[in-house]
Amino acid sequence: MKFNNMIDHTLLKAEATTKDVDKLIAEAKEYGFKSVCVNSSWVKYVKEKLKGSDVLVCAVVGFPLGAMSMQAKVFEAKLAIDHGADEIDMVINIGRFRDDQHDYVLNEIKKIKEVMGNKVLKVIIETALLDKKGIKDATNIVLQSGAEFIKTSTGFSYSGAQVEDIEVFKEILGDKVAIKASGGIKNLNDMKNLYKAGARRFGTSAAVAIVKEQGKQ
């Protein structure tokens, strides 16, 4: 199995330069990755550079903390879509979620989805900051929200994608909502294990190394 078309080739570090983004774009085209995932200020630039290719543009919203106002997130999402984003990866308000303000979290996801039209929304719940009950509750919120994907992590917290968390997602969601694993995916074995658990999209900055490893097998 080839994982190329399941990978969001990702560059989200604060210090990313134009040269870094150009390299990301070139690699995504060369290896046939599903998307290039960048911070929202890069969307217009990346969209222009990807013109004529099948690679999608994915933008993060409310990243990495998820703690800004709902209005700010909705505006960022709309602007990213207007600039050409095909997909949005948003971070939920984790503090509000942990305060049991589940209606707030659900409403925020729905409001972002509303401004996206038919574009794909992935919802990051940051599993590292939740216990097992929290992961289940957050998964159920995503199930009600109309989002196309649930996503494990930003890659900026204590840990990233874990097989056991993907299994919890799958048990609750079945095939109703797709699963994206991200954070700490460093090699082909990581990706295979997460795929077996139910993940069908992968966010990683190690994509080139992983597909080269895949090519040797």
Swiss-Prot record:
Compartment annotation: Cytoplasm
Alphabetical list of CDD domains matching this protein: DeoC
SMART domains named among the record's database cross-references: DeoC (SM01133)
Cellular component, GO, one term: cytoplasm
Pathway the protein contributes to: Carbohydrate degradation; 2-deoxy-D-ribose 1-phosphate degradation; D-glyceraldehyde 3-phosphate and acetaldehyde from 2-deoxy-alpha-D-ribose 1-phosphate: step 2/2
GO biological process: 2-deoxyribose 1-phosphate catabolic process; carbohydrate catabolic process; deoxyribonucleotide catabolic process
Pfam families given in the database record: DeoC
Disulphide-bonded residues: none
Protein name per its UniProtKB record: Deoxyribose-phosphate aldolase
Native source species: Mycoplasma mobile (strain ATCC 43663 / 163K / NCTC 11711) (Mesomycoplasma mobile)
